[in-house]
Amino acid sequence: MSDSSSSSTSAFVSSLVFNFAIFCAFIGLFLCLRPREKHVYQPRCIIDTQPKEEKPEPSPSSPFGLFAYVVKRSETYLIQYAGVDGYFFIRYLFTFGALCILGCLVLFPILLPVNATNGVGEKGFDILSFSNVKNHNRFYAHVFLSWLFFGFTIFIIYRELRYYVIFRHAMQSSGLYNNLPSSSTMLLTELPNSVLNDEETLHELFPNASEFTCVRDLKKLEKKVKKRSDLGNKYESTLNSLINKSVKKHNKLVKKHKPLPSTLDYTAYVKKRPTHRLKFLIGKKVDTIDYCRDTIAELDEVVDKLQTSLEERKKVGSVFIRFRSQTDLQTAYQAFLYSKKFRKYRFGRALVGIAPEDIVWSNLDLSMYTRRGKKTISNTILTLMIIFWAFPVAVVGCISNVNYLIEKVHFLKFIDHMPPKLLGIITGILPSVALSILMSLVPPFIKFLGKFGGALTVQEIENYCQNWYYAFQVVQVFLVTTMTSAATSAVVQVIKEPASSMTLLASNLPKASNFYISYFLLQGLSIPGGALLQIVTLLLSKVLGRIFDNTPRKKWNRWNQLSAPSWGTVYPVYSLLVTIMICYSIIAPIIIGFAAVAFVLIYFAYSYNLIYVLGHNADAKGRNYPRALFQVFVGLYLAEVCLIGLFVLAKNWGATVLEAVFLGFTVACHLYFKYKFLPLMDAVPISAIESVSERPEIKYPMDLGTSEMKNVGRAYPEILEKLSSSSGSDEFLETSSRTSENTKEKIDKDDEGFAITNISSVHKMPSFVLSYFSDLAASNRILTGFDRVLQLLPSFYDIPVRVRNVQYVSPALKATPPSVWIPKDPLGLSTYAIEDARGKVDIFDDNTTFNEKGNLQYTGPPPDYDEAIRS
């Protein structure tokens, strides 16, 4: 059998050389291509569709200046250009990268000597792990250092949760968000029919509401609109293909000096008109152009009739409630959370801060029991997937320690004769790459099940994906791989001595860290390098795009629409790295060093991409961040339970009791944090809103608004009574603000803050790195940091946004007839197509042309392009 330590070393060397070579190649190509391929590497600086306030200035051309430039950006700069969601993800990477560096400084000087000296004689990296400790009294070093490191991790979680809540409240109170329609609109779901059909009840519950919009059954309309949209896309694609072929055929005839057609129509240069079948294989074959043109015209009439007969449609169990201001909305929302008045109606959920484009309209008509049933089905399917996905992942774990199996599994004997370098590739590179590929297949299916399970918004789908994908990662990438790696490394000894299986598994568990060293090398070198190079985007831009982008719309979309990160997929990958780092921080502390390097490089790659490359998706207001922070507790639990198990097997009862005590402390902190912070994520204290917009003398509450929100909610009946006797909203505002007086008195009068109007330039702000550590040192400012967060927000957050009337209705009700965009060709076919469809379908050839090579080009936006407007 090959020596396990040499295999471990060769696996590490192979992984390091391979991933470092990939990293250097990717970074070298990125630095060479970046100056001339700005559409790939700095699109946000140059595309016209990017809002002015979100266009960063070009990055430095110097490779060395680039790193310093990105790292020195201030928090305000990151919020403005990376967006709130991007800013919090960068903060997440920085927080745990800094924690890794701190862990190296604290744990390495103590644990590495404790593990390495006078041990049991392990070799390779195993000499630095828990498994090499011979004197069991040394385990107390592991216990107290786990208290120190895990305790500081819990403090960081508390600090960041508190910071997020303050940031969220400050952001919602800013002029920008305070005036958005989404900040004054509530979605109430699963209303009983008695309330749904009696608007008087809704008016009694929400007398300060300005508008009620009931959701109606629009399935028939939505089906017709989708069919019309699909036909419009098919019509546009067919006409573009026909015109492109005709122009190319014309150019060939001219080049060969052959006669040109005497008449101009669709078949002048193409032998047969395009056709398609109405059903796959067995459907009737129809002329594509005629069918699409005539059917779209017929559907226009049907859709228009259905859109104008909205009142005839049946009401379903959801209603949108519009309020005059965010203050009114938050008062009603806090009453929904805390007032007994609402409990007797058994409403479903109340959602605030959602824009019309965020809503999954097809799920608004689900009853409570239907939604629960569908969600149960989704959760069951995913649970079974986690179980059965373990088999291929277990194979990967076995491969990483295949050298231990050779002695008993005879058909693997040939591996023993492989060169060390090849064996290193098999045990080091292959498993980590295979595991990454396996896990990349999961997120799309989770999102599908999230939508099927009744998610109400795209943000909820992302949150659902974040939860389940993280569960997949922990179970498959960590637990299954760790257990199979540990079991594989001990399999020969277990076969010889079955009674000692638990002891052997415990002693071999730290050895599984060798696989995760390779995994961190992959995630920390190849992944950041690939993220910066963006090889897929580069290929699409330079090669594949020229082949597949055969319409003006596709070309315009390629160059003017930014791809956006899916936070429900991105966060779990790095939450897993945090989990692995925490779990092995005491057992095999050397892994923290690799984790630190990985987080630093990932931090730089994502900082650059979020500033210069990636766009913004649906505004989640950073909600994925606290979810990821709570998931860190999973790593803490696993680490502490694992240590307890190792201490029990070593029969060191003192260490066992001490670690069990800290486990209880961790559970208590977790429960307290959920109790303290979860109710504050969506609700905003009235005093926070008024302190910014209406009553600057009112201060932000010291307890983040917990007591104030409960007071407002419980006093809601009195507020309603006061409102019903008043002629306007002034008295209501006075009443609601009075509920925060007790909180106001608790505020430290000497709290140092900054006026949001003093922001002159984001470039004069201190860098994110300096700001982060100065905040960590100044704990008092963090505890009363509402004014400071207001100062961090970009200047355009101070300006109340003026938006046109935003309607909370299904997109099908606002759908307009398709606008077909075709290129203006020198033959006149586009003019012929426009005349052929006149009165039936709107066809445009504006802002398009053909170049001298016969390739179509766009010169402006599509005819139906409309600038994105915040809602």
From Swiss-Prot:
The similarity comment for this entry is: Belongs to the CSC1 (TC 1.A.17) family.
Task: Name any one GO molecular function.
Answer: calcium-activated cation channel activity
Q: What is the topology of this protein in the membrane according to its UniProt annotation?
A: Multi-pass membrane protein
Highest taxon of the source? Eukaryota
Per the UniProt record, which residue ranges are transmembrane?
11-31, 92-112, 139-159, 380-400, 422-442, 475-495, 520-540, 562-582, 586-606, 629-649, 653-673
The name this protein carries in UniProt is Uncharacterized membrane protein C24H6.13
Compositional bias (Polar residues): 727-740
